[in-house]
Amino acid sequence: HLDYHHTMEEYRRAKGLLFQQCRKAVLNLDDEAGRWYLDNIPCPAFTYSENKNGADLSARNIRLFPSHVEFEALTLGEISRVHLPIPGGFSIYNALAALAAGLCLGLALEDMARVMPSVHGVKGRVEVVPVPRAYTVLIDYAHSPNALENILSTARDFTAGRLICVFGCGGDRDKTKRP
């Protein structure tokens, strides 16, 4: 959203205003901004992490596949196996954020983990295209250099051989991304 906020500092400040109205925040401890908000917001926080000790919710025994991810979610001594039919390491973070929000609302970890296999991704975001060959085709609307790097990293996680990327610049919202 830098096309609107112009700098990361301005974006962080604007986003921080939202926490003035919250009873509880859900923050990713693996993210620099999440750690910054933890120290700079007025409301209590529920934290999650893929790899930091001390988070309220964490993931372990992570397995990445071309069509899905699997991991164990741990919170307050409770462990639930999660199967999410959306590939990529970032999917683990999205699942942890959703689980953390649900836990804050009083939902049971086991109940949420049970329905995760029925979650479908957003069309055009790490969308697996079925093909009759022994390779994987993904469609992703990677709309920034960082997003393109992330999808290529995701694909590399489960690609043994050659990785081919075809990309274009559709749309015209952010004029700084194309002539």
Protein language model annotation of sequence segments:
Residues 27, 139, 167:
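Active-site flanking residues adjacent to catalytic metal/cofactor-binding acidic residues
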Residues 136-143:
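Switch II (G3) loop of P-loop NTPases
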Residues 97, 143, 147:
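Conserved cofactor-binding/catalytic machinery of classical short-chain dehydrogenase/reductase
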Residues 2, 89-90, 143-144, 172-173:
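Glycine-/small-residue-rich active-site loops that bind phosphorylated ligands and cofactors
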Residues 30, 142, 170:
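Anionic group-transfer/hydrolysis microenvironments
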Residues 1-136, 160:
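Acidic, Mg2+-coordinating active-site environments of NTP-dependent enzymes
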Residues 122-124, 146-179:
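Active-site beta-alpha connecting loops in nucleotide-dependent enzymes
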